[in-house]
């Protein structure tokens, strides 16, 4: 078994933070094509949403494309990127959104893995407090 002996290598944290901010921009503008590129194209990818669960890339695509075309803007309160070795990372986020004039706080967690085609989200969860 190969042990992970590098945590939070600064160059990887910067790379993943930059990628995450591109993901966030795509999410907030509801750019589904870009969002699809960030997720692992596999039947094994999982996304737990606010009111729904998706199992597999196709379920995630169907969900994203069925949402109304409104913007999902939110304020990032706390973003944490932790890398493990050269090829895996956890990205966690606390955020604030206004929905129908009501302030809501939420959180999101994602596991990212590096594949030959680049970094991909392999598991994601989002919820409100």
Give the ranges of each region predicted by the language model.
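A short hydrophobic beta-strand element
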Residues: 85-95
């Amino acid at each position: 078994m190969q042990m992970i002996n590098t945590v939070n290598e600064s160059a990887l944290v910067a790379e993943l933070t930059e990628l995450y901010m591109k993901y966030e921009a795509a999410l907030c503008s509801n750019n589904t094509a870009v969002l699809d590129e960030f997720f692992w194209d596999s039947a094994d990818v999982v996304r737990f949403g606010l009111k729904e669960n998706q199992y597999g890339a196709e379920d995630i695509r169907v969900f994203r494309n069925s949402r109304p075309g409104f913007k999902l803007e939110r304020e990032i309160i706390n973003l944490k990127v932790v890398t493990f070795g050269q090829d895996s990372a956890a990205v966690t986020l606390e955020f604030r959104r206004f929905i129908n004039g009501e302030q809501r706080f939420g959180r999101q967690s994602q596991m990212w893995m590096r594949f030959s085609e680049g970094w991909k989200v392999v598991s994601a969860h989002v919820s409100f407090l």
